[in-house]
């Protein structure tokens, strides 16, 4: 089965998974149920129970059998495609197994789980989740790089504006007032008299 969370009591809680799963017969791959009908898992019995199964995929046998310890009465569940026995429907159980009575209890070793939307693999063999993480890291790196480029651009732009202002102030002729012109004229006339 795919990754699931196990509580302290030994049960697997499939409802905590983010993506739904379908359960298939290992022998012929016929779909017999999905995690939307998940009830409980018993690790000690290597089984899990669903409240419902896919119609026409599972056959409940008409004969009743008794468990080895004599505490349970059940009917076997068979795959309709390959006739493989894949689980049981408990008709009579002790109190501690009341939660699985009259439901579909499947043997973990007879079924396989396929998690929908989670096992997409690209050519490099990475899952979609791994690709998303790598893309996120790349985006963060690019964002950081772009921000540093922007800061450098701002610094260079500010320096360039300052240089342009300095150059334009040097190129402009100084506008002199009347007194400056008179002083130049006096200096010029003194030179010419000598």
Swiss-Prot record:
It comes from the Eukaryota. PANTHER family: NEUROGENIC PROTEIN MASTERMIND. Zn(2+) binds at residues 25, 28, 79, 82. One of its GO terms (biological process) is chromosome segregation. Component of the CENP-A recruiting complex that ensures the integrity of mitotic spindles through maintenance of kinetochore factors mis6/CENP-I and cnp1/CENP-A. Maintains the deacetylated state of histones specifically in the central core of the centromeres. Residues 174-194 are annotated as: Disordered. Residues 20-116 form the Mis18 domain. Residues 174-186 have a biased composition (Basic and acidic residues). GO terms for molecular function: zinc ion binding. This is Kinetochore protein mis18. The gene is mis18. Signal peptide: none annotated. Homotetramer. Component of the CENP-A recruiting complex composed of at least mis16, mis19, mis19 and mis20. It is found in: Cytoplasm; Nucleus; Chromosome, Centromere; Chromosome, Centromere, Kinetochore. GO terms for cellular component: CENP-A recruiting complex; chromatin; chromosome, centromeric region; cytoplasm; kinetochore; nucleus.
């Amino acid at each position: 089965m795919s990754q699931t969370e196990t509580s302290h009591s030994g049960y697997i809680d499939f409802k905590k998974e983010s993506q739904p799963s379908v359960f298939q017969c290992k022998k012929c791959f016929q779909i017999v149920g999905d995690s939307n009908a998940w009830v409980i898992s018993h690790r000690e019995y290597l089984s899990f129970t669903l409240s419902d199964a896919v119609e026409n995929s599972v056959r409940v046998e008409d004969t009743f059998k008794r468990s080895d310890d004599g505490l349970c009465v059940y009917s076997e569940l068979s795959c309709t495609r390959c006739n493989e026995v894949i689980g049981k429907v408990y008709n009579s159980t002790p109190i501690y197994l009341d939660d699985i009575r009259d439901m579909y209890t499947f043997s973990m070793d007879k079924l396989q789980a396929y998690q929908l939307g989670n096992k997409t693999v690209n050519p490099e063999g990475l899952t979609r989740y791994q690709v998303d993480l790598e893309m996120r890291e790349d985006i963060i790196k690019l964002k950081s790089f772009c921000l540093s480029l922007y800061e450098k651009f701002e610094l260079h732009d500010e320096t360039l504006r300052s240089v342009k202002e300095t150059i334009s102030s040097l190129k402009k002729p100084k506008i002199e007032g009347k007194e400056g012109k008179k002083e130049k004229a006096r200096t010029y006339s003194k030179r010419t008299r000598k």
